[in-house]
């Protein structure tokens, strides 16, 4: 039986705190905290969870964590807000350059995308 939490099917053969990291917005440390609050041993595999344990985990996540779609939309709204107010980070988001001071002369290919070739300038004849 697959256990589904906030729209994500958790892998059955992984330990609980690793399986919870498949949910967007939950890392290892927050997964351990969630399992401790729910009273579930973190080393039990997901397939061995009872329905009560899964329900307790759902309750803890629902009460105290913003995950999946809500978190994704909040991040997108934060980026949109930066672009709307026209701050430095917003401008860099808009033109697709690194935000945090990295050099862009030679690198930053991940952020800038595939290389665009520019035609060579004609050399002045002597």
Curated annotation (Swiss-Prot):
Located at the top of the head of the 30S subunit, it contacts several helices of the 16S rRNA. In the 70S ribosome it contacts the 23S rRNA (bridge B1a) and protein L5 of the 50S subunit (bridge B1b), connecting the 2 subunits; these bridges are implicated in subunit movement. Contacts the tRNAs in the A and P-sites. SUPFAM superfamilies: S13-like H2TH domain (SSF46946). Keywords: Ribonucleoprotein, Ribosomal protein, RNA-binding, rRNA-binding, tRNA-binding. Part of the 30S ribosomal subunit. Forms a loose heterodimer with protein S19. Forms two bridges to the 50S subunit in the 70S ribosome. InterPro entries: Rbsml_uS13_C, Ribosomal_uS13, Ribosomal_uS13-like_H2TH, Ribosomal_uS13_bac-type, Ribosomal_uS13_CS. This is Small ribosomal subunit protein uS13. Residues 99-126 are annotated as: Disordered. Pfam families: Ribosomal_S13. PANTHER family: 30S RIBOSOMAL PROTEIN S13/40S RIBOSOMAL PROTEIN S18, SMALL RIBOSOMAL SUBUNIT PROTEIN US13M. Residues 108-126 have a biased composition (Basic residues). It comes from Porphyromonas gingivalis (strain ATCC BAA-308 / W83). GO terms for biological process: translation. The keyword Transmembrane helix does not apply. GO terms for molecular function: rRNA binding; structural constituent of ribosome; tRNA binding. The keyword Glycosyltransferase does not apply.
